Each structure stands twice: as structure tokens, then as C-alpha cells.
Amino acid sequence: MTISITADDRELHVTPQSLLASLEKLSAIAAIVLLATIMLASGADDADLTQDGAGNNATRSSGTEWQNASETVASGYVGAPYYYRSDFKLKRPNGTDMTLKRMGWDGDAFYFPIDGGARVIHWTGSVGYMIDFMHNKAIARLGKGAHGRKIKNGVVEDVETTGTLNGKPAPSPLHLTDLFDRMEFTHGHNVLLLSGLVRFAPITAKIRPYLGIGFGASVPHVEAWFTGEALDRRTNEYQYAGPAFQILAGLELRNGRGSFYLEYKYIWSSIEAALTGGKSWSLKDLKSDWLPRWFLEPFSGLTEMPGDLWRQFTRWRSGEAPPEGNFATTLSSHQIVIGGGYVWPGRATAGAGAVQP
């Protein structure tokens, strides 16, 4: 049996098997995150106890001490985005200047690296700010999964177009695989955001709602391969691509020093990417007589994003035009994330909430 779901002119084909597999993966990941945070939180419970004048441990309060607390929370989360359609504008020096209308995007949340993020929040009473780095995947509908892997029942989309392709009127509708061999952001539709938060009065001693809005930058890993073109014309690199913002609402559960949350996010980002015909820079590309390759290899992946962004900056500074052209689109998504982390009390309130016997 196959269930078809249509929303905003987007059709999804969901089988009971695929839905069950996705739920099992999400449950397993959430369980690992929650278990790890519970272990950290329980290990810190004794640190939260204060002593009275006789040296006896005092009991902690039921959790109401967080109402006006100054504290810092570091956490990680997992999620799966639902993308909306968007126009895709492509311009290349071969006479291509076209718009692909309302292209669809899919995620591949549980293919490594798993979709999610990491963040740090500093609260001062009921207001706070958050630095949030989020990694999701976004893949054009070419009948493939992340990194071009084979998937069952893959859908190749036909889209309406305007403009020119290779100097001639673009065909409309266009079968996407006639243009792209790969068009995706699978090492990340990455966004880095600074958000302002407000948390409301606790619903219970341990559960508290919050809202937030944030602005930042999109830093996707652009993978753009065109059908029939040589390997050295493929773009595979991180780029600063434009502004991004998010709106969020969630519920936080406290257990000792543990912070667990269920959160809704709406994320929008603008992507204006250069088609450079290059791959990500890493330490493996460094020619050195005094740094052996066995030393460089373990750190090579960590240098790809900063190396690519530095190359992008030098191209911008020199006025160098991308040799293969450029494209522009937007990505907007809804998602529910599940996460957990650890709470560090602020100095002024580290002993707050202790109850004398």
C-alpha cells in the first residue's frame, strides 16, 4: 500500500515500510541523545546540593529556581525538514539564462551525516540569546538520494521553465536529469544563526515553553553536476550563499542539570551560489615537506569549510567571476527537532533554589 500526500502542490509517496523505518531511526537517535543527557544530568545532581550550617546536605527545590536563573545551556538535536518548492535561476556562459519554476526539494535526514544541529543558549531570567548551527540536506528530485545514492521508487521531476538553455529556448517542461546529474546540498544546507529567545512561566515545575526568532547566514555545501559535462566542471564546495532566518517555538523539560526539548522550527534561507568547477580545499591539498601526510589526513575534513570560505573571499576580493556561472534559489522548511543538553548555572545563581531543612 502506498499513501500519497499532497501539500502546496507537492506530492509525497509514503509506504508503511518507509514510514516505520523513519520512525524507528528517529526514535533510536532521540533515545541516544536523551540517555546521554540524563547520564550527564544525574551525575551532576550531587553538585546541586548545598550544605547547611551543620554540614548536612540540603534538599533541592522542585525546579522553580529556574524562573529567574542566569544560566548557559549547551545541547544537540536531531530533526527532519519538509521543504517547500522554489524557483531556481541558472545563468552560465554557454548561453544558458533560465528559470526552473517551482522546483521540489527532498531531504535525506537519516543518511550520514544525520540532520540536526548544535547550539548554546545563555539565559538571563526570562530572556536569552542563542547561537545555533544547523545541518540539513536538500536534494533536487533526480531520482537519487544524498550523494547520488540509489533509492527505491526515486522520482525524477519535470518542471516548467523560461529563458534559454545552451543559447536556445529552454524546453518546457524539462526533465531534470536532462540538465542535472546532481544538484544538492548534502554536506549541508548549513545555517548559522544568532537568535533572541523569551521563555514564559513554567507550565509545571519542570516544563517551560519558549519562543524565538533569529537571523544569520546560509553556508551550504554546493554539489552541482551538469549532465554530460567533464569532472573538472563539477562544483563541490562550501560557500557563503546569503542570509537566513528562523522562527521557533518549543517546550523544555528540566531534570537536574539536564535540558530536553521538543521544538518546531521554520527556516528560510537565500542561496546565491557560484559554479566554480572546483572541489573543497583541505589539508590533503597542502604540499609540504615538513608535515607528513599521515598527520594531515585526520584533520583534512575539518579544514574544508574554512578553506572553501577563504577561497571564496579571495575570489570576491580579486573580482574573479565564477568560470561555470551561478545560480540562485531559496530554501524554506518546517521541521520538528528533538534535543537534549547540559545546564551550567550562572555565578549569581549557582546555589539558588536550595531549601534549608
Language model features with spans:
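Bacterial N-terminal signal peptides
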Residues: 29-38
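Residues that define the transmembrane beta-barrel architecture of outer-membrane proteins
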Residues: 70, 112-116, 186-192, 207, ...
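Membrane-spanning beta-strand positions in outer-membrane beta-barrel proteins
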Residues: 73, 128, 208, 259-261
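Outer-membrane beta-barrel translocator domains and adjoining extracellular loop/strand segments
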Residues: 86-92, 142-148, 221-232, 273-280
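Gram-negative (and chloroplast) outer-membrane scaffold detector with strong preference
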Residues: 121-226, 344-347
